[in-house]
């Protein structure tokens, strides 16, 4: 995956999973240096441009297998159910340490002590992202 800004990332998509009463998509963002990520694009069997301007590659089966031993940087959980409002999240996680407005329908709530960031979207699906607390500090420092 290459963002519209040119940064590369490697995601492992686990498809739909059921956790508790929620069906969700589970995605692991793997820890790979940028130069290695760029080199991996030559092993793609498929390339897709997204509406946002990013590019998504699908690696061949051998390269997918090789990358499976990488450390997980973040783990994203995207429930199919899209009615998880701020009150529901506040009841389960408490008040966020910080939050920011992403756009008119979306807020980012940050819980560094838990290693959790939550995108709350009033017109779409929520996204829960887990980052180890040690990595969370590094990620926040890069901003």
What are these regions (language model features)?
Residues 1-143:
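A cross-family detector of function-defining hotspots
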């Amino acid at each position: 995956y290459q963002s519209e800004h040119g940064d590369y990332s490697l995601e492992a998509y686990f498809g739909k999973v059921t956790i508790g009463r929620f069906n969700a998509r589970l995605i692991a963002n793997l820890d790979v240096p940028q130069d290695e990520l760029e080199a991996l694009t030559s092993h793609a069997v498929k390339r897709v441009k997204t509406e946002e301007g990013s590019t998504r590659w699908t690696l061949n089966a051998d390269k997918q297998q090789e990358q499976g031993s990488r450390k997980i940087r973040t783990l994203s959980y995207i429930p199919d159910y899209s009615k998880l409002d701020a009150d529901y999240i506040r009841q389960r996680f408490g008040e966020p340490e910080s939050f920011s407005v992403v756009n008119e329908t979306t807020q980012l709530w940050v819980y560094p002590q838990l290693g959790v960031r939550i995108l709350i979207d009033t017109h779409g699906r929520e996204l829960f992202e887990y980052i180890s607390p040690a990595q969370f500090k590094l990620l926040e420092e890069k901003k």
